[in-house]
Structure formats: structure tokens, C-alpha cells
Amino acid sequence: DGCFIAASAPNPSRWGILQSIDDNNHQKADIRMHENDFFNEDLLCALAGVAGEDNVLMSEPMREHTTFKIGGPADVFVTPDTEQGLVATLDTCYRCDLPLTIVGNGSDLLVGDKGIRGVVVALGKGLSDITVDGTHVTAAAGALLSDVAAAAAEAGLTGMEPISGIPGSVGGACYMNAGAYGA
């Protein structure tokens, strides 16, 4: 019995289909999944197949992933460590019509005691590349703002100092229009 590693588009009734693929890439079976049935072991196996086995957790306490240290469990918590893993994880969630929440560093993120239903995708260390080329700084969504400011300073660039004290990530800062200390 192999993992379920492929997904096909959901039909209009909000059902998704996971396809079971054996070790020789032959389709074995289709598993129908409804939007409320995402605790299925086959789905966890599918997500592990695209994001990495160690990167998929069930009932993960969100308090471990927020700067306020509060929050109940995420039904499924995924931390893809490559861009390809992220794209494949999002594709699987969309194709199976799963509830999806994307988080960064968890700064200013308030999660209730009941947690987050569905799949939480966290952009972290594997998606935090920072490159400096002359006067241009390029940073991935999971890069911490403090690390971006430090990389700019190390390259002799100025202007990023105000973000060094913000505990967020680039993706979260862009999405939420973060700012503090004149940033």
C-alpha cells in the first residue's frame, strides 16, 4: 500500500478526489473526500508525499507557532521546506477543496482556543532565502524581517533598520502591510 500522492480537481459538489498511486506510478484507486473529512490518513499521506513526511503534523498546537503563544490546534499543520513542496501542498489543498490558512512567523496572529479547522501551511526556514545583489535585496516569504534588515546592513545598505524590530516574516508583512517604528 503506497501513499496517496496525487490529487484531481474537485467537482461542483465540493468533493475532492485523491488518487492512490503505487510505487510504479500506476493509479490504484480514487478516494473521495468531502470538505469536512480532511482528517483522513490518506490525505495526510498525500500531503506528506508532496511536503515531506516530517513536515506534516496533525492537531499541532498553534500556540507553538504564534508570538503571543496562544491558540488551539490546527487540524493539519504543514511546513513545506521547498518552493516546489509549497506549490504542491497548495495544489493538493485546492484540488481537494480543503479549508486552507497560510501563516508566516505568527506575529500578531491570534488563534482561538478551538484552533484552526483545515490545513495550516506555515512558511518557515525552508522558504527564507535572502540574497543581496548590489543594491537589491530579494527575500522569500518565510524570511524574517530582522534577517532581511541584517543582510542589508551587512551589505552596507541602509533604510531597512526600522523593520529589524518587527518579529514578522516578509510574506506576512506584505500581506498585512506591516509597519512599526517608522517602517
Named regions from a protein language model:
Residues 19, 26-27:
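Low-complexity, intrinsically disordered or signal/transmembrane-proximal segments
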Residues 149-155, 159-183:
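A gly/ser-rich beta-alpha-beta helix-loop segment of oxidoreductase catalytic cores
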Residues 29, 33-84, 117:
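N-terminal flexible segment immediately upstream of the FAD-binding catalytic core
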Residues 62-100, 112-157:
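N-terminal glycine-rich flavin-associated loop
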Residues 9-10:
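Ser/Thr/Pro/Gly-rich low-complexity, intrinsically disordered segments
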